[in-house]
């Protein structure tokens, strides 16, 4: 299920690029609590060993840490090191499958949980997909 949502976001990113929209960026941040889980088949970087993948995803993927490096200066009150939560997830107050949309200045435009708002264009008559796409386009 998670791979499907990440795959849909990858497809949306490629769709935007094909439409000539190249001033938006996507990335995934794996939660600290999931750092010991295999995510290869979720991000589809190993097609030979992942039966759920048609193509390699192009969206960059990174790992959240709990080392406090992001809890300095203006973020001091937002997170703390070694609390068993990732620093970035603490700062943004996210949960599993949250999609964060930022504007050009890095300000929050929207936070949507993809567990409850399936982005698949074949679900909800494409309404969630279109809403997410429009939020991204309007944040540019």
Cite the ranges covered by each PLM segment.
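Solvent-exposed loop/turn segments at secondary-structure junctions
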Residues: 1, 31-36, 65-69, 107-108, ...
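Conserved redox-active cysteine motifs that mediate thiol-disulfide chemistry
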Residues: 1-11
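Helix-adjacent hinge/juxtasegments
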Residues: 2-3, 15-60
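Short amphipathic alpha-helical segments and helix-helix/interface helices
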Residues: 9-17, 89, 133
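Structural recognition of the beta-strand scaffold that forms the well-ordered cores
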Residues: 24-30, 59-63, 98-103, 108-111
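Short, internal strand/loop/helix patches
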Residues: 27, 43-96
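Short aromatic-enriched loop/helix-cap "lid" or pocket-rim segments at secondary-structure transitions
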Residues: 38-41, 74, 113-114
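Thiol-/selenol-based redox modules, centered on thioredoxin-like
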Residues: 86, 94-140
């Amino acid at each position: 299920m998670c791979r499907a949502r990440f795959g849909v976001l990858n497809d949306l990113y490629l769709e935007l690029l094909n439409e000539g929209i190249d001033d938006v960026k996507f990335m995934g941040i794996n939660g600290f609590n999931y750092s010991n889980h295999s995510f290869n088949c979720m991000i589809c970087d190993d097609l030979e060993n992942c039966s759920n993948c048609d193509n390699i995803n192009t969206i960059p993927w990174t790992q959240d840490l709990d080392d406090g490096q992001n809890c300095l200066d203006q973020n001091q009150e937002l997170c703390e090191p070694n609390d068993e939560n990732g620093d970035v997830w603490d700062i943004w107050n996210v949960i599993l499958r949250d999609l964060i949309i930022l504007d050009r200045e890095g300000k929050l435009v929207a936070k949507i949980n993809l567990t409850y708002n399936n982005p698949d264009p074949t679900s909800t008559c494409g309404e969630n997909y279109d809403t997410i796409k429009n939020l991204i386009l309007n944040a540019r």
